[in-house]
């Protein structure tokens, strides 16, 4: 776990607890997306470098997001600003999504394949994983041309490497004793 993930964990946990308490998980997801989108904008990054006071930085975020930012979100923005933590917003968001998945009894699966898979193939993989893990499955799919052939499936800390490259490596290892 990276330092950013370690720092992001309590922020995400606190946000998620507020979201559960107020039944506002989707709203908080949108708020986090909004904040991280603004913070990652190239023109806005200059403000995040410390050239502006935390008070005014918070005010800018709050003013831009008047329509979606409630009192709890204002407090989060102020806290992120005071602690100069806008750089870990992606980590906070990812952790929040994982907490939501756990809460809803969903596993998040990262699927990488050498070539583009059709939607029906991805759905078949999803069904197999749901039967295997006995949970709903959300697949995050990416094409990775670095994979020789086949696919790599990552669930939590478990990796199923079904690539040709891995099979060749295993064969090579077994022949070399």
Curated annotation (Swiss-Prot):
GO terms under cellular component: plasma membrane; proton-transporting ATP synthase complex
Main location: membrane
Keyword Lyase assigned: no
Alphabetized GO MF terms: proton-transporting ATP synthase activity, rotational mechanism
The entry's keywords: ATP synthesis, Cell membrane, CF(1), Hydrogen ion transport, Ion transport, Membrane, Transport
Membrane topology note: Peripheral membrane protein
Disulfide bonds: none
Protein localization: Cell membrane
Organism superkingdom: Bacteria
Secretion signal, residue range per the UniProt entry: none
Function noted in UniProt: F(1)F(0) ATP synthase produces ATP from ADP in the presence of a proton or sodium gradient. F-type ATPases consist of two structural domains, F(1) containing the extramembraneous catalytic core and F(0) containing the membrane proton channel, linked together by a central stalk and a peripheral stalk. During catalysis, ATP synthesis in the catalytic domain of F(1) is coupled via a rotary mechanism of the central stalk subunits to proton translocation. This protein is part of the stalk that links CF(0) to CF(1). It either transmits conformational changes from CF(0) to CF(1) or is implicated in proton conduction.
Subunit structure: F-type ATPases have 2 components, F(1) - the catalytic core - and F(0) - the membrane proton channel. F(1) has five subunits: alpha(3), beta(3), gamma(1), delta(1), epsilon(1). F(0) has three main subunits: a(1), b(2) and c(10-14). The alpha and beta chains form an alternating ring which encloses part of the gamma chain. F(1) is attached to F(0) by a central stalk formed by the gamma and epsilon chains, while a peripheral stalk is formed by the delta and b chains.
UniProt family annotation: Belongs to the ATPase delta chain family.
The protein's name in its UniProt record: ATP synthase subunit delta
């Amino acid at each position: 776990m990276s330092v950013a993930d370690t720092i992001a964990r309590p922020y995400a946990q606190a946000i998620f607890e507020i979201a559960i308490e107020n039944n506002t998980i989707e709203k908080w997801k949108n708020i986090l997306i909004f904040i991280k989108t603004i913070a990652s904008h190239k023109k806005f990054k200059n403000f995040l470098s410390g050239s502006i006071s935390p008070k005014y930085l918070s005010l800018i975020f709050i003013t831009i997001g008047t329509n979606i930012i409630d009192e709890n979100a204002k407090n989060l923005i102020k806290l992120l600003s005071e602690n100069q933590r806008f750089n870990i917003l992606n980590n906070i968001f990812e952790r929040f999504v994982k907490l939501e998945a756990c809460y809803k009894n969903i596993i998040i699966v990262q699927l990488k394949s050498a070539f583009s898979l059709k939607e029906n193939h991805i759905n078949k993989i999803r069904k197999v994983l749901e039967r295997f893990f006995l949970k709903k499955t959300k697949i995050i799919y990416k094409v990775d041309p670095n994979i020789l052939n086949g696919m790599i499936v990552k669930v939590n800390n478990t990796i199923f490497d079904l690539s040709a490259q891995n099979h060749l490596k295993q064969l090579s290892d077994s022949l070399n004793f």
